[in-house]
């Protein structure tokens, strides 16, 4: 229930968590917004992180204003053919970029603080990009596109841990 999620948020804070991180949460958005509002009314002071694939509507991002402090979003491809091949979503680059632009507009440039010597992001956007084998040029294009559109107003996390495992191996 909304009350139970609010209680969980407050429990995380009491346990010393640095943030409340909702993973792939879009389909629960109205309930999460209500739970966070309820928890904040009861003293929640932790940043709220929205951990998403990036395939969000602009409306969904706008609806989260006042709830989400940090977006942790993927930006998987600039290539619609890669998006079609790996995600069955040839419109992913356009949809994800529109959502990313709105995320940056809604939460602003990165801000942070320190808790017990640990740095913590309190506001902003972190864009994750998983570098795929055989798609280096698209990864370069992703980095260039993010930099040209946002500069230092978003943080970029490049990941290269993808390891294809063959069925015969």
Predicted regions and their residues:
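Conserved AdoMet/S-adenosylmethionine-binding subsite of the radical SAM
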Residues: 3-168
